[in-house]
């Protein structure tokens, strides 16, 4: 159903990602940006409050009709859970407690993970660091879709289905592209999460458990906030690999929309990324950017020139050190 996309292959490039060179140039001109590279201790209480709100919602939905359980999981729970995945993104960069307390951040990530219903935090951190170091690297960066995704989801309707199924692809894609041995922290993350899920089931009932899981699945699929998955690196304009978003949903997502700024300065917490743009405005104001994630989703589905193949990809150099 729907028209077929014109792209049949990834955009292969043989140059380094632009972020390291731009970071070096900006720091030489604006060394004060180094002062923004510091922990964000506010994340600790923000995440705790988010988890408490979600626990309260488990209580509020436990006796609702099923239609209202699903309704509120999409309208409210999905926003909270997607926001929590982006809090976990901040935690993966060691922002709550700082780099000198890396293990504290891993434990805090497991705490933040609780409201999602599925173990996520530890595995995300391992793959996300590879994404930053080796952006677009073949068989390393699992943010790049598989060849199957690019080949199969090649019509308007199929791209729409692909957007809905985004959380499943992000969950299983690493197993096909860059499988890693399981670590003890991932096992602990899984055991803690399953234990929490069982407690939710026995304390609140099956409706609260379904609400929690549906909020994660729906929130990471066809949802306004999910526009960031596509907006960040899908090549809407040839030659441009990373795009920022400067719209209001940054307030719910720890400024993940400031994505060029984030890749240029991964040691700057989200709350300080607007300052990076302000200080080095001449480097960012003229770069292509978005003001609406909803429009990004619409354009991705309806534009015949855009598909899961619309990513810049690099052959690995062979000297990569993976997490």
Curated annotation (Swiss-Prot):
Motif (Histidine box-3): 259-263
Free-text tissue specificity from the UniProt record: Detected in testis. Detected in pachytene spermatocytes and round spermatids. Expressed in retina and retinal pigment epithelium by Mueller cells (at protein level).
Membrane topology qualifier: Multi-pass membrane protein
Motif (Histidine box-2) on chain: 128-132
Pfam families: FA_desaturase, Lipid_DES
Keywords assigned by UniProt, alphabetized: Endoplasmic reticulum, Fatty acid biosynthesis, Fatty acid metabolism, Isomerase, Lipid biosynthesis, Lipid metabolism, Lipoprotein, Membrane, Mitochondrion, Myristate, Oxidoreductase, Phosphoprotein, Transmembrane, Transmembrane helix
Subcellular location: Mitochondrion membrane; Endoplasmic reticulum membrane
Keyword Transmembrane belongs to the record: yes
Chain's role: Has sphingolipid-delta-4-desaturase activity. Converts D-erythro-sphinganine to D-erythro-sphingosine (E-sphing-4-enine). Catalyzes the equilibrium isomerization of retinols.
Subunit structure comment from the entry: Interacts with RLBP1; the interaction increases synthesis of chromophore-precursors by DEGS1.
Family, per entry: Belongs to the fatty acid desaturase type 1 family. DEGS subfamily.
Name of the molecule in the record: Sphingolipid delta(4)-desaturase DES1
Organism of provenance: Mus musculus
Lineage: Eukaryota, Metazoa, Chordata, Craniata, Vertebrata
